[in-house]
């Protein structure tokens, strides 16, 4: 049975359009691939703490030199990396906050993007140490992305693609549901965009 790691990020619970989209995506994936084992990581209800000094020190220490305190400091990071390693597909449902990922998702990223654990630094740049797999990101945006008044830049899509790529995961697909704060007509268009996007996806679960 394929394993899905589902990262939900919005603090708006049932009022969240990204969470509604995430639920639709899980149903779509199950229609396509059959039953899934879902690793449900709700980063709003159960937030991952930001990196503290103990973890920063432990992560920079050679593995052979770590003692019980360092292993304890890295325990949550190891759990989160293990969930990512176990997943055949990763699904992220998230709003865009101030042009990029919410801090709750950034904290998760900081725990899983770790030197000499999920990537290795070389003179040519970072080399990912994880196996590739599909990452599907559904992003709910309050405003538009186009040239003209009120538009904003998308710095989130290239960031997600780059950060997952740095650990070896290159199959990153992102859909933006735009103008979701502008009324029911725009919300309907956002979900139409989601439906069109899922129809164009070509992914394979293990």
Curated annotation (Swiss-Prot):
**Record field: transmembrane:** none
Q: Which UniProt keywords apply?
A: Flavoprotein, FMN, NAD, Oxidoreductase
Question: Which Gene3D superfamilies does this entry report, sorted A to Z?
Answer: 3.40.50.360
Where, in this chain's numbering, is FMN bound?
10, 16-18, 140-143
Query: What EC number(s) does this enzyme carry?
Result: 1.6.5.-, 1.7.1.17
Q: How is the cofactor bound?
A: Binds 1 FMN per subunit.
Q: What catalytic activity is recorded? A: 2 a quinone + NADH + H(+) = 2 a 1,4-benzosemiquinone + NAD(+); N,N-dimethyl-1,4-phenylenediamine + anthranilate + 2 NAD(+) = 2-(4-dimethylaminophenyl)diazenylbenzoate + 2 NADH + 2 H(+)
User: Which co-factor is required?
Assistant: FMN
> By its UniProt entry, which InterPro entries does this protein fall under?
Flavodoxin_fold (IPR003680), Flavoprotein-like_sf (IPR029039), FMN-dep_NADH:Q_OxRdtase_AzoR1 (IPR050104), NADH:quinone_OxRdtase_FMN_depd (IPR023048)
Molecular function terms in GO for this entry?
electron transfer activity; FMN binding; oxidoreductase activity, acting on NAD(P)H as acceptor; oxidoreductase activity, acting on NAD(P)H, quinone or similar compound as acceptor
Q: Which Pfam families match?
A: Flavodoxin_2
Which SUPFAM superfamilies did the record assign? Flavoproteins
Query: Family, per the entry?
Result: Belongs to the azoreductase type 1 family.
Q: Function of this protein?
A: Quinone reductase that provides resistance to thiol-specific stress caused by electrophilic quinones.
Q: How does it assemble?
A: Homodimer.
The name of this protein is FMN-dependent NADH:quinone oxidoreductase 2
Q: Which organism is it from?
A: Cupriavidus pinatubonensis (strain JMP 134 / LMG 1197) (Cupriavidus necator (strain JMP 134))
């Amino acid at each position: 049975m394929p394993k899905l790691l589902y990262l939900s990020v919005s603090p708006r619970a049932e009022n969240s359009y990204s969470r509604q989209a995430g639920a639709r995506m899980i149903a779509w994936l199950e229609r396509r691939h059959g039953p899934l084992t879902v690793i449900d990581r709700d980063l709003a209800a159960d937030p991952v703490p930001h990196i503290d000094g103990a973890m920063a020190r432990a992560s920079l220490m050679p593995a052979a030199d770590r003692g019980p305190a360092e292993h304890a400091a890295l325990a949550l990071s190891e759990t989160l990396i293990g969930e990512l390693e176990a997943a055949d597909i990763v699904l992220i449902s998230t709003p865009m906050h101030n042009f990029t990922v919410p801090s709750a998702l950034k904290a998760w990223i900081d725990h899983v993007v770790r030197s000499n654990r999920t990537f290795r630094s070389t003179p040519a740049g970072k080399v990912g140490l994880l196996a590739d797999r599909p990452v599907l990101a559904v992003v709910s945006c309050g405003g538009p992305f186009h040239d003209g008044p009120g538009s904003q830049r998308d710095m989130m899509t290239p960031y997600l693609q780059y950060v997952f790529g740095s650990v070896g995961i290159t199959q990153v697909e992102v859909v933006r549901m735009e103008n979701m704060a502008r009324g029911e007509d725009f919300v309907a268009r956002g979900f139409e965009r989601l439906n069109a996007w899922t129809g164009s996806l070509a992914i394979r679960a293990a």
